[in-house]
Amino acid sequence: MSYWCEATVVDGIVTRAVRITAGVDGRIDDVTAGVPRRDDDIALGVVMPGAGNAHSHAFHRLLRGRTHGAGGDFWLWREAMYAAASRLDPALYREVARAVFAEMLVCGYTAVGEFHYLHHRHDGAAYAEPHAMELALAHAARDVGIRLVLLDTVYLAGGIGAPLEPRQRAFGDGSAVGWLRRWHALDAALPVDGLVTLGAAIHSVRAVSRGDIRTVVDGLPPHVPLHVHVSEQPRENAESFAAYGLSPVGVLAEAGALGPRLALVHGTHLSDADVAAVGAAGAHVVMCPTTEADLGDGIGPARRLADAGARIALGSDQNAVVDPFLEMRGLEAGERLASGRRGCFDPAALAGAAGAGGYAALGLGSHALAVGDHCDLVEVDTASIRTAGSALAQLPLSATAADVRRVVVAGRVVADGGILVGAGDGTGTAGTDPATLLRSAIAAVDGDAAREESR
């Protein structure tokens, strides 16, 4: 399959008349610039590397537009999140994830890292198929054609030194060894198709002890990407210091987790010493600007982290907003508000965080529309009410998800003008507007909750 692009925008460089050829493995075989279109080329307009959503909780999408009436903070919002989690079984989980992944796809995300901890029944018992919830996510990704890195998460405690609460029992595996046993079994059970890969996550230092973090790190293959929530709230820092005399970053470093494969999610409340340690380790930091704003988390030290050597990526997290352009803009907006300066991250750096940064944090390799890279790309409308007149290299600060036209994953068009083209899997998603899938999934979850309440 070959695509002739009117222009590509990579690392802030605009290149005209580019042919990108994808091989049967879905990777780029050839890139040639300054060439005329051939009859067998698929013609695209302005193309950018697809965005890699480095942090998502798909089921949190159920809360969009439903948690703003009572004010509160992150901890109050978490109560609503637990209630949403309690409604899900494998069938509903697949339906919700399929709808959310479809929304991501048409909005310009070509890959997603799903930070997944809904492993078991609500009472903590395993399903008859022990990987039912994980396979639901894998099937959902294949249903729509998005690239998925399943970040299977270890979650063992309800707080430092505290047991899981009853509403958290679905998250736990009893011990770090028990989680590792299930993780390796899942690795063997996931079909190998190039679209879905397995990663790992530690929920947080609140949910996994220092000793268990060490066990997890030692028990995982060294190539597997490892993610962890870090310092999203000041309370987490206070609890970590009270228990260990260390910040969460310090705990991770002491447990052997801090290094180039680690992706720290949020990092909103890091000390100068934390920033230096993360940068020196060459770790990834996944900022989630729209979620951090929605939950009132604060503004993280993104520029200082990047200057220290950390690699910045972006994620939609709770999916209150699904728009990679707004995440890019939010990263820069936070820095401007905190510093009083413009241009803390230039457009090329913002696009790099959304694209190459996300793919690197997810262990997906280089992502620069180069030979050997995944052929994952998005076409952007440059003549819309938002983008008309914009310099192509500055699209990260003018476009939105509404400007995404065609989306290509693994060398195949999977979305066009906000509509799924179809992954060729026989699930009937071709021609579907993701809004239809979302309405259906939300209605199914709401109906299930209503039936429970009436019993």
Regions found by a protein language model. Name each.
Residues 62-96, 121-130, 157-177, 234-259, ...:
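Active-site gating loops and adjacent loop-to-helix segments of metal-dependent hydrolytic enzymes
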Residues 254-257, 261, 303-383:
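His/Asp/Glu-enriched, well-ordered alpha-helical/loop segment
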Residues 8-17, 295-297, 302, 359-397, ...:
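Acidic, glycine-enriched loop/beta-strand segments at the rims
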Residues 125-265:
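Metal-coordinating catalytic core of metallo-dependent amide/deamination hydrolases
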Residues 374-425, 430-439:
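C-terminal cap of metal-dependent C-N hydrolases
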Residues 1-36, 46-47:
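N-terminal metal-binding scaffold of metallo-dependent hydrolase/deaminase domains
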Residues 65-147, 178-193, 439-450:
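Alpha-helical scaffold segments that flank or form the walls of functional sites
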Residues 49-61, 225-232:
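Histidine-centered catalytic micro-motifs
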